[in-house]
Swiss-Prot record:
Primary localization class, coarse: cytoplasm
Descriptive protein name: Cyclin-dependent kinase 6
GO cellular component terms listed in the entry, alphabetical order: centrosome; cyclin D1-CDK6 complex; cyclin D2-CDK6 complex; cyclin D3-CDK6 complex; cytosol; nucleoplasm; ruffle
Residues with the Phosphotyrosine modification: 13, 24
Domain of life: Eukaryota
GO molecular function, one term: ATP binding
Originating species: Mus musculus (Mouse)
Name of encoding gene: Cdk6
Positions where N6-acetyllysine occurs in the chain: 264
Residue positions of the active site: 145 (proton acceptor)
Amino acid sequence: MEKDSLSRADQQYECVAEIGEGAYGKVFKARDLKNGGRFVALKRVRVQTSEEGMPLSTIREVAVLRHLETFEHPNVVRLFDVCTVSRTDRETKLTLVFEHVDQDLTTYLDKVPEPGVPTETIKDMMFQLLRGLDFLHSHRVVHRDLKPQNILVTSSGQIKLADFGLARIYSFQMALTSVVVTLWYRAPEVLLQSSYATPVDLWSVGCIFAEMFRRKPLFRGSSDVDQLGKILDIIGLPGEEDWPRDVALPRQAFHSKSAQPIEKFVTDIDELGKDLLLKCLTFNPAKRISAYGALNHPYFQDLERYKDNLNSHLPSNQSTSELNTA
């Protein structure tokens, strides 16, 4: 990370427009004046500092992002640069410079004409999404906040994951803002405030998979408990053995109910797609499919052109299903 009191970020990058503002800070579309005026996305985040400087957790997260960037994975957004500027003794402005992609999956789904996204396009996008996610998991990165707004879609239909590996960097900025973070893609173990690991991302993938068919979210809760209730209305109340032990909210707080047919809520999905969706939307994270397992699901068996180069982005013998968060 380069620190410059004259703000190198302001010298090298010319802001064109503000393109987003969320719990994590503002995002700007900008020109990179040192690289032919290419468009980039600037994400500006405020980080709490102390006498010792920037928190070690922040430095580690940036180091992980830098390491992932060396692989240039096709389904992960590129990180071009990181700049820091001290604002005060207790705060630093961190500027992350990413490649710019014009639309996210939310915009894409809003714009798609009737009758919706072709089933083959959904399959293609899902495979790319899972390939990017498996790459992150194989490098011990849990996304934690996967949703259509941070899945980018290029003009050629390439999927790129964004906003990963930044949970600790974002924590201070989020405490300063009142923006509500959506619950609609959160796994049951997160809603119950239980321990969690990579399976949380596969739950989010299941929600996104369903939304590609529906063009609207599958579970739209207004609070953690309401969200959990909406989930159980569809997938049914799990057995006692699948309810986490370390949570304040007991299984008995919810009415006993059976699972409803998923095709009632996700029409046009075929049998293999339904099987994959239910494996993602499995209540118990230990029984949920992994990203690597999902990539090898029969649903994708006719996408051999992707499987040919899948292994070039995976470490050998890497199990990705049980990585714990620190």
